[in-house]
Amino acid sequence: MNEETAKEWLKKAERDLKAADVLLREGIYDYSLFHSQQAVEKYLKAFLTYHNKHFGKTHNIPLLIDLCQSI
């Protein structure tokens, strides 16, 4: 378990989620969607990191989901 690195991923994901919320309220939908996607990716990476599951350098959310399901 790599708890500290997982916590770092969670902090980054939370910042992206907050940014997405602010942008959504301002009607800036494309950037809100971008930060939402970034948050999802980072939450998945936090989970994988916590469970010591290697994911390499990727932005492939379906792959990350598959890796999470394999745990």
Indicate residue ranges for each PLM-predicted region:
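Terminal alpha-helical segments
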Residues: 1-71
